[in-house]
């Protein structure tokens, strides 16, 4: 972060949802760290942002959420607006997020691959710093045929129905509809943080989770000789999709983040800042992670599979979900 960092401590032992903080407009590069302490031992805390303290609910945007039982405090970097005051408030829910969802804190990472990484593609560079400014949850598994069929009423997969195989041949549009229905279902069950939703991960969120704090070609290191311990690919998959969770997860607990089926990402495929893209149509979506039929180079953390239209149906294509703020709603 550029500029001075000042900590604003937010003590919330009782009046959860009542505390609020105001940041006045500023032209400086100052960054404040909003620190929340003394939270209950269970449940989920959500931090909201608005330009009007008296605004109604729909004018407050959820910018960060975290399981309060995991931390005694949570620091969130925030920047004042150049034009309007920024108000922050806290809410808390006594809920348990589904156990298959892993919470990831805000953080910075290097996205993309360096010029010297073997078998890299031109759209993977240049390496650039990315800030994930919100906590979010990501599914430790790819969505299975069982989960997809139960919610959607059909199974587009190329295989016979098998409960623990990842669903494949899913279009981006269908994956989005799955997320919409899952949001409605878990909202009704009161297991979803307020202001958050199920959706596809952005490319940045996906690579952040895949890398798990590493800068190597794969989440476990650089050696292709170890890939078969971590992902299903051309040399160990017998040419077929494998059950989820059968190999070693990455350091943050995500299974099949390398290989098995490709995973749709939410945002539109574009060149990185200062980089080159294979398509500039502005309508294409992107797969990540590689698949069971792919060579090792496609399973690298930085690899961006060829862009496709949202209605594209591919035998290698699946997805996993995140619980996160609506795309574009976080602070950046």
Residue ranges of model-derived segments:
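A short glycine-rich, aromatic-capped structural motif
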Residues: 95-157, 170-173, 258-259, 325
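Disulfide-stabilized, aromatic/cysteine-rich ligand-recognition loop
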Residues: 79-89, 93-94, 248-250, 279-332
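Short, well-ordered junction/capping motifs at the entry into regular secondary structure
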Residues: 231-258, 279, 306-310
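Short, composition-biased motifs enriched in small/polar/acidic residues
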Residues: 14-98
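Short, well-ordered surface patches within globular domains
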Residues: 109, 162-228, 264, 270
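Bacterial N-terminal signal peptides
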Residues: 1-10, 14
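Acidic glycine-/aspartate-rich tracts in secreted/extracellular proteins
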Residues: 39-42, 51-55, 114-116, 143, ...
